[in-house]
């Protein structure tokens, strides 16, 4: 490696953005094929390439940051700005779903029966599984904060315990959401109510799965002593993302489950 007199990381050419983009194309096309033609081939191919890309990209970043020392304070500052901008873009992403929901529900058209929920739709009881889901995510927000404080204090054992609890709660949330979808008395095809409900809660569920994966990687890295109290941006980014997922759920619960029912 040539000698450099600056603190910035000159990234090597990487195939993972391209394979990641291709996997996203395969997954979205595969979703359409699954919905319309009941074929899961493209979707499976997309998920497989996505998992391979994630594994190899994460491996490269861990190698560059932990073992080669490329993540200097200047690089970490750039990564922090990047993560903040990414979360802001996600806020706008979900804003679109809330806009669609409120646009449809605040002024229901005659086709919907002039009321919300539309005629013939039996909404889910917000005081049952959705309320349990809310408490599960709020508890996971507490445990991820506990993990962060434990890491800052150099308490590895408590950090691992708290991280394990957070991951378990994330998986539990996903299972509860899956059971709720399975038992829901309406489908994604049931007009604008079904569309807005399943797209908004489904995308949030996808974000919970992504966040849980991120936290699992952090857990495995902590088992290998990768994080220190002053060098742990990977974990910090995962924690920020998890808090974002938490806050989005509170808005979903209040808007779609409670007010919308």
Swiss-Prot record:
PANTHER family given in the database record: CYTOCHROME C OXIDASE SUBUNIT 3, CYTOCHROME C OXIDASE SUBUNIT III
Keywords from the named record: Membrane, Mitochondrion, Mitochondrion inner membrane, Translocase, Transmembrane, Transmembrane helix
InterPro entries, alphabetized: Cyt_c/ubiquinol_Oxase_su3, Cyt_c_oxase_su3_dom, Cyt_c_oxidase-like_su3, Cyt_c_oxidase_su3-like_sf, Cyt_c_oxidase_su3_a-hlx
Main subcellular localisation: mitochondrion
Organism: Rhinoceros unicornis
Name of the protein: Cytochrome c oxidase subunit 3
The organism's place on the tree of life at top rank: Eukaryota
Reactions catalysed: 4 Fe(II)-[cytochrome c] + O2 + 8 H(+)(in) = 4 Fe(III)-[cytochrome c] + 2 H2O + 4 H(+)(out)
Oligomeric form and interacting partners: Component of the cytochrome c oxidase (complex IV, CIV), a multisubunit enzyme composed of 14 subunits. The complex is composed of a catalytic core of 3 subunits MT-CO1, MT-CO2 and MT-CO3, encoded in the mitochondrial DNA, and 11 supernumerary subunits COX4I, COX5A, COX5B, COX6A, COX6B, COX6C, COX7A, COX7B, COX7C, COX8 and NDUFA4, which are encoded in the nuclear genome.
């Amino acid at each position: 490696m040539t000698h450099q007199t600056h603190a910035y990381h000159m990234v090597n050419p990487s195939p993972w953005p391209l394979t990641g983009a291709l996997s996203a194309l395969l997954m979205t096309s595969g979703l359409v094929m699954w919905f319309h033609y009941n074929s899961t081939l493209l979707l499976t191919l997309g998920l497989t390439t996505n998992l391979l890309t994630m594994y190899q990209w994460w491996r490269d970043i861990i190698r560059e940051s932990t073992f080669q020392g490329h993540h200097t304070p200047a690089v970490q500052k750039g990564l922090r700005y990047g993560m903040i901008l990414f979360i802001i873009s996600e806020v706008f992403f979900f804003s679109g779903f809330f806009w669609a929901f409120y646009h449809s529900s605040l002024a229901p058209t005659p086709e919907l029966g002039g009321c919300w929920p539309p005629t013939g739709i039996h909404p889910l009881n917000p005081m049952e599984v959705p309320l349990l889901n809310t408490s599960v995510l709020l508890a996971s927000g507490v445990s991820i904060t506990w993990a962060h404080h434990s890491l800052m204090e150099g308490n590895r054992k408590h950090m691992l315990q708290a991280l394990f609890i957070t991951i378990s709660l994330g998986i539990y949330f996903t299972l509860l959401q899956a059971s709720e979808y399975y038992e829901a008395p309406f489908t994604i095809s049931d007009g604008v109510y079904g569309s807005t409900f399943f797209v908004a809660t489904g995308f949030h569920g996808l974000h919970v799965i992504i966040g849980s994966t991120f936290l699992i990687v952090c857990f495995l890295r902590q088992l290998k002593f990768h994080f220190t109290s002053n060098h742990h941006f990977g974990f910090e980014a995962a924690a920020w993302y998890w808090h974002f997922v938490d806050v989005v759920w509170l808005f979903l619960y209040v808007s779609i489950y409670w007010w919308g029912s």
